Amino acid sequence: MVNLIRERLKAWEHSEYPGATRTTTELLAYWQDEGREKRLFYAQLEAAKTIIFLTEARQDLLQGIAVPRDDPSADRKESGYSGFLRYACKMATGAGKTTVMGMLTAWSILNKVASRGDKRFSDVVVAVCPNVTIRDRLTELQPERGEASIYRTRDLVPERLMPQLAQGRVLVTN
């Protein structure tokens, strides 16, 4: 399935992202701008684009790609719990996982703010950490940190979109 996703992702890119929202195409262009002072790593761009592709690509490009839902047990379903999609990006130490988290957080929040009724996006993001040290480090994902947030320190969001990003919430917990 991984090779099929890579192949379709390339086709999606070459076709200028059919199915993507205006917000998404703006962010993708911003992240890939050759004139960026703070260039993003190839692995960071590919990880973010893959998740975005799986969420927004036109249906014909997703044909044959079925990511299974993470469904709860039968007794949990009876209690009202529902399944969700869980995506994973395998990245090496030092490859910029926090930056990818910031890219995807900004993408989701900004799309939700632009289109409140679109259920593909959320303006609330929860980051669950394995320990206090990582939890403290990931507070840079919180938009209310403004210029100290990852969105400005790593130039993930154009300054003019920061007020919209501030309408979202990022909860970091362990």
Where are these regions (language model features)?
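RecA-like P-loop NTPase motor core of helicase/translocase proteins
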Residues: M1-N174
